[in-house]
Amino acid sequence: MSYRVTGDAARKARERYELKQAAAEFYRKRNVPERLEEALNSTFCLGPEDVYGHLANYFAQFSMPPTICQIRGRKVLDGSGEPTVEVEVSCTVKNSDKRICSSVISAVSEHPKASEGLEQERNHSADTAIQWLKDLSPLLKGMSPNEQHNIDQLLSDFYQPKIEEEKARRQMEREASPMAIEPVPSPVTSPALGKKKGSGKGKKAVVMEKPIPPKEAPEPVVPGSPAIGALSLAVAKASSVLGKTPLYLHIATLRNEKLPSEFIMPTPMISVLSCGKSSPGKLNLMKEVLVIPPTGLTVQQSLDMALMLQNQIVKQINSISKTGPAIKNVTPLGCMLIGGDRIEQPLDLICEACQHVGLELGRNLYLAINCAAHELMDYNKAKYEALSGTFKSPDEMVDLYVDLINRQPAILALLDPLRKEDAAQWESLTKALGSKCFLFADAASKPVCKLLESADIHNPPCSGTVIKHTNETTVSQLLGSFKLIEGENRVTILGCPCEESVDDSIADLAVGLGARFVKLGGLLRGERSSKYNRLLAIEDELTQAGTLGFWTKHEFPILSDVENLPGPEEVE
């Protein structure tokens, strides 16, 4: 019996010894004794009030880097009340699973907003996006949020079969249903003023007008695609949160090999009026009238100036109203919707407002016009309807813009003055006005992914392209598009779509990417003003850090791909 007791005791002693040895080896491999000794010595020397807090901070630097543990998606509403998807990223941090951040981006449809079935389409896209996120969650599990480019490549690889499936599905639908053949507009004929040679007396000559290029088919939007862009942004935000650095600094480190010593805030293009197709008057040409501050102003000064001008415009509209204060109709772009019967009517209104508040157009502020020409084309007449009942050919539109800029030199930029298909007229317009104002392509430009695939930013020939973070666009693709545009001596603009979400990350993206301009809309909607507020916060941080810089001039780029283009001009 005593032998058995002795044997059990020896076995237990041996097990305890082996356990102690295993524990010692476990900690030795991880250098715990040395680091513990160092931590205790430094804590004693420093004598911090919060001893455990100091020890926690010391050991935190040796913890394993956070890794993604879960991706979740939920359906939310954007600023216009339309369904979209929010992406939430959770990470394993110091052995605990924690929710880190979320992001929402705009879901842009390939169909007009008024099209039937849009609500069902948006709901289907959001539901599909949520399912995609469930599929992506195990693929990203264990990856570090710092692996932005690797994760974006994984997302692009995941998305590519989806777009091929969507193309195949659409092809099958076309083959299964009768083809709807759109009538091709025939060349429009117009009577000449002179008599036709060799014809009977009094007969007028008939002039054949050039047919316009047909409308290009819109790029297919794959249901669920917002999951890709939103997840890419959420990963970038997670990396910045875990690294305890603002998102704009994180984006800047992705863009540059080293952090720049100075940050220049993008110049805001602020929408104040809308006189487009949806406005009550005859004028269709000005979907947005925007103000652009001169260089040298802070974002705060620019917004104060725009707000003062906007309030004065409201006073003027109320003063001429016969029924009391006019109802302030606000578009989804965040600006006032007014009617106009003449092309210069909204410009005259702004000019009068500037005089009342002591601003000089062309010196204290400039104007920009979003023409949205693709919305003005009447394909039956093969002409643009700049004013209701007034139709102009693409060549006549070029003459209209040249005359307008000559009479209104304070106009610094035109956005989408023509359809992207009217390449010859874009070239003519660039030759005529390229040294006087910026000509930007918004809807006339390619989506970011197609822009990178083709590496062609010369069609249409323009001063710059409005880049938007929507649908399947990843952060890496945004970085690539900015590099491409700047490499071709073009101006970079980061913009919001018409239906915008409440996420204010676009402000950080604009600063981190080094955008020359940022187009966020007007000041009259919450989802727009929140982005301006984020710009103000970033500007304040840069001011406190002493790293805020300023643009010195508005300089129009030299477009080498347009022959005989005049040299660049500069304005303050």
Swiss-Prot record:
The keyword Lyase applies. Transmembrane segments: none annotated. It comes from the Eukaryota. Residues 181-204 are annotated as: Disordered. Residues 194-204 have a biased composition (Basic residues). Pfam families: Enolase_C. InterPro entries: DD_ENO4, Enolase, Enolase-like_C_sf, Enolase-like_N, Enolase_C, Enolase_N. Keywords: Glycolysis, Lyase. Pathway: Carbohydrate degradation; glycolysis; pyruvate from D-glyceraldehyde 3-phosphate: step 4/5. Signal peptide: none annotated. Belongs to the enolase family. This is Enolase 4. It comes from Xenopus laevis (African clawed frog). The lineage of its organism: Eukaryota, Metazoa, Chordata, Craniata, Vertebrata.
